[in-house]
C-alpha cells in the first residue's frame, strides 16, 4: 500500500526560513534509513506559497491565481511517499518522523503530519 505523508507548512516555512540544521540532519538520516529499507518512494519540501500558483475552475471562466495563499497551517510544506504494508505501519513511520521534531525542537514546537493512502486503479474497480 502506498501512503503520502503531508507535512503542514508553518509561518517560518512560508517566510522561506530554512528548518533548523539539526532537524534537517536527523530527518535526512531517517529518510536514508527508509530508502535503504525500500519503504520511502519519494520525498521533498515545497517552496513557500508565494512562489506557487493555483488554477481554479467553477462558476465562470478558469482562474489562475498567484500566491501567496492565506492560512499557512492549511498549506502543504512537504511530503513523503511510502510503500508500507498497512495504515498502522504508516502511522508508526509518521510517529517516528514527528518524534524527531519534538526531540530536537522541544516540546512546545507545533507541527502536523497528515497521512493519506494513495489509491491506484485497483481501488476504483467495481
Residue ranges and their predicted role:
Residues 1-126:
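Conserved, structured core segments of small domains
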Amino acid at each position: 500500500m502506498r501512503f503520502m505523508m503531508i507535512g503542514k507548512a508553518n509561518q517560518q516555512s512560508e517566510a522561506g526560513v530554512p528548518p533548523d540544521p539539526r532537524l534537517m540532519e536527523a530527518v535526512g538520516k531517517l529518510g536514508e534509513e527508509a530508502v535503504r529499507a525500500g519503504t520511502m518512494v519519494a520525498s521533498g519540501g515545497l517552496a513557500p506559497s508565494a512562489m506557487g500558483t493555483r488554477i481554479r475552475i467553477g462558476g465562470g471562466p478558469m482562474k489562475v491565481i498567484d500566491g501567496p495563499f492565506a492560512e499557512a497551517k492549511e498549506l502543504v510544506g512537504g511530503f513523503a511517499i511510502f510503500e508500507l504494508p498497512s495504515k498502522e505501519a504508516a502511522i508508526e513511520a509518521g510517529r517516528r518522523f514527528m518524534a524527531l521534531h519534538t526531540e530536537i525542537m522541544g516540546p512546545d514546537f507545533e507541527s502536523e503530519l497528515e497521512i493519506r493512502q494513495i489509491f491506484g486503479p485497483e481501488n476504483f474497480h467495481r
